[in-house]
């Protein structure tokens, strides 16, 4: 799916893994229901809750041109306790 860009792995999101929460960057136009349906179908998991936020806009300079990088929405997805996403498993 084009709307889910990639999983996010930072110090905070690694701490969220202990609470069975996973973080993804998604397209701004994607709705929670679309993302929830895609996550459940693709990973065969049960989603309990979803939280989303848009990180603040930041300026970026490339030579004399000042612009903004591509915007995205960050989704924090909580799964039922007996499910997990294999992308994030330690081996």
UniProtKB/Swiss-Prot annotation:
Any single biological process term in GO: translation
Keyword entries, A-Z: Chloroplast, Plastid, Ribonucleoprotein, Ribosomal protein, RNA-binding, rRNA-binding
Keyword Plastid appears in the UniProt entry: yes
UniProt record similarity statement: Belongs to the universal ribosomal protein uL23 family.
Functional note: Binds to 23S rRNA.
PANTHER family named in the record: 60S RIBOSOMAL PROTEIN L23A
Domain of life, per lineage: Eukaryota
Protein name as annotated: Large ribosomal subunit protein uL23c
Gene: rpl23
Subcellular location as annotated: Plastid, Chloroplast
Organism: Anthoceros angustus (Hornwort)
Subunit field text: Part of the 50S ribosomal subunit.
Assigned GO CC terms: chloroplast; ribonucleoprotein complex; ribosome
GO molecular function per UniProt: rRNA binding; structural constituent of ribosome
């Amino acid at each position: 799916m084009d709307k889910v860009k990639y999983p996010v792995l930072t110090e905070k999101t690694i701490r969220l893994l202990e609470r069975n929460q996973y973080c993804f960057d998604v397209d701004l136009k994607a709705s929670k229901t679309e993302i929830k349906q895609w996550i459940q179908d693709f990973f065969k998991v049960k989603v309990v809750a979803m939280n989303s936020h848009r990180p603040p806009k930041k300026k970026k300079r490339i030579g004399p041109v000042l612009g903004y990088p591509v915007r995205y929405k960050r989704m924090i997805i909580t799964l039922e306790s007996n499910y997990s996403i294999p992308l994030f498993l330690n081996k």
